From Swiss-Prot:
Organism from which the protein derives: Burkholderia ambifaria (strain MC40-6)
Protein's UniProt name: Probable potassium transport system protein Kup
Catalysed conversion reaction: K(+)(in) + H(+)(in) = K(+)(out) + H(+)(out)
Domain of life the protein comes from: Bacteria
Pfam families: K_trans (PF02705), K_trans_C (PF22776)
Matches recorded under InterPro entries: K+_transporter (IPR003855), K_trans_C (IPR053952), K_trans_N (IPR053951), Kup (IPR023051)
Amino acid sequence: MNDTIQATDAAHAHSTHQHSMRALAIAAIGVVFGDIGTSPLYALKEAFSPAHGIPLTESSILGVISLLFWAIILVVGIKYLLFVMRADNNGEGGVLALMALSLRPLDSKTRVAGALMALGIFGACMFYGDAVITPAISVMSAVEGLEIATPHLSHLVLPITIVILIALFWIQRHGTALVGKLFGPIMVVWFVVIAALGVYHIARVPGIIAAINPYYAASFMADHLLQAYVVLGSVVLVLTGAEALYADMGHFGAKPIRLAAYGLVMPSLVLNYFGQGALLIQNPKAIENPFFLLAPEWALLPLVVLSTVATVIASQAVISGAYSLTSQAIQLGYVPRMKVLHTSELAIGQIYVPVVNWLLLFVILCIVIGFKSSDNLAAAYGIAVTATMVITTVLACVVMVKVWNWNRLLVGAIIAIFLAIDLGFFGANLLKVAQGGWLPLGIGALLFFLLMTWYKGRHIVKERTAADGIPLEPFLQGLLAHPPHRVSGTAIYLTGNDKLVPVSLLHNLKHNKVLHERTIFLTFVTRDIPYVRDDTRLSSRDAGGGLYIVKAQYGFNETPDVKAVLEEFGRSHDMTFELMDTSFFLARETVVPTHLPGMSIWRERVFAWMHQNAAKPTDFFSIPANRVVELGTKIEI
């Protein structure tokens, strides 16, 4: 009897686990695979762009389809899903998480560590270069289906694209948790539809299946040489969004993403590309728009609508990724403080960063108006993706050797294959710099300069502060030995270094000559892991006389919460805190550029401008503004 009950419980647990896995896989399809899932709208069309001069013969079609197929298998199916996704930082993925993981076993002061940090930051900057192109090209290519379905409405493609994009960014501040539940099922429908369209045409031209043989890819490269290498720059469009598989791993887990990729996404993409190839063999004139011409005439308008919805979902994933990456970069100290709003009480990852939102929209609208069509924009797409792919491979190599202690020869063999592929794609995309590749490169380079300037500037400020600082604990002992006038209430001094006396305390003692009966020195520290366990978050020291030194640790995926820290500290020390009865003392730093060693004077001025425009600590830490006392201090750099 007991055996029967245990067997039933085990079967129920297994069934529940499978159901949960399927639910996560469907949710992942709606978030992770939107970008790569909408690539069939433009990838093959761009590969046979007239500018490439590739004839639409059966052999060249088989060759290009073979290249697309093996790019998906090698880069998505093997590199990312089997290797890169193993390199998780406590379950979190993405280029910054990978960078933090690769730096962990290294001395942060070495040149190697500095180079890896710069690589990781540049990879993050290139993501933003990609983030401004994905919504523009995706939505535009979907709306361009109107040119096939109803040619007399072709003049409305640009206005409709602009309206959709403005609406998409406008709703961000309200959160997308509610409609987000529909993303997964809608994208499942999308992948089923594009697979069915592909199967229909494969059945009519079954010879296209021969493209599975890599001989056709190799033969195409050998026959066309330089032209074929240029085509590689378009082939990479089938991989846009591959980085999202790794970047969004923390939201869904590796297993659900692999299940979705191998079970639905990759088969659907392959079937659709093969279907487009079959259509072109049958009717080379279909190169006008091979994706939409897969559909029978009666299904064109519904397919345009479904495509538009799918591209909006793909754009949403990129926008959410930009918010998450910005939040990580703020916590890791690479970006100035910005206002980060949580749009859902239930979902921790649902955030909204107003500055990023409106900057993205402005740049995207400029791109749409400037490039006017997805064909023109396709030349700009790919270089940011391939640069990030190369950086991910290099950082993963360091993790394999330094963190996992894999055999160096084995790692060398694996990385040599992946780097050869990545660098091949990256080199092909460099040929498109003049046609539009300058755009993501320019955006990435500008952001890289700003982020490195901010990081270097903050480092100099910390050095100057530490050099002039006074050790905290001896100072407090002296203060208690000769105490100033004590006043009732609680004072919280926010400080970046729990070993030094906050400048705000020195100014308060100098001008007001009082010390609150309960005084807390609070320091927030960001770790190189995504999340910190609640039971290890707080550490505190009782300095006596109602003085406490408190350190709160957060992961780079978390947002510091002053209220939660005080509540936790109060519980452990049998105290209560009311924010409206507590005074917060902050040092308002004014950075003064000088000719002191550190950075060139013009970079110091840029840093000073960034510092001046960073979000106020009251906004960032959600402290009531009427409970804050800011005391000014000048720092020469």
